[in-house]
Amino acid sequence: MITGGGTGIGEALAHRLHDRDNTVIVAGRRTEALDKAAGGRERIHVLPLDIDDPAQITTFAARVIRDFPETNVLFNNAGIMRFEPDLAHKRDLRDAEAMITTNLLGPLRLSNALVEHLASRPGAAIVNVSSGLGFVPLVAAPTYSATKAALHSYTVSLRAALAGRIEVIEIVPPGVRTELVPGQEHEEQFLALADFADQVLSFLERTPTPAEILVDAVLFLRNAEGEGRFGTTLSTINPQPH
């Protein structure tokens, strides 16, 4: 089951998992996008879900357990990114609060709603999609970066807490050509979506599956602190105007 499965990374992973003979549930707010992602594929099922609504999450989880009891893998992929360019002045925090709700509370709530069911299934896994910006933040997107840093930390704790019962995996994307923000799908310096999805699947098919799915393009961010270059990396991705 993949949240945010109607577009971008979620859609690309759904297609590849389906093509490997998996039954896939794609979930998200926009039914039209979900239907397009399903594209008439027999084993892709569409379930609407507003990940920001706790009541909907409860109802959704109950429906998954009832109608798709063999569900054993949850991809917490839904996320939003909004820029916050002026932190030096008092501002409306609705965008920041929306990102916290979608990017952090959403995965926590949905994992909580399904954890007991997943623990009862063989081969169970929770896969959280964070971001390289959780390791070195983009100054113009501080709350987005912070939510992904928090999701990484939560994933580490969840992995330890569920060891032996549910495998917990973190996918750490670099910049990928998706519609996460307007125009991102045209950014030539970002990784092509198809290439990223293919690389992710190659990691997921390894035995054992790595705890973190790290394509080459994200290592610059993921390993910055451990390699003693956090400050220079922060400056590189956040150049100061002249």
Residue map of PLM features:
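Active-site helix of classical SDR
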Residues: S111, T147
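Conserved glycine-rich cofactor-binding loop
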Residues: G4-G8
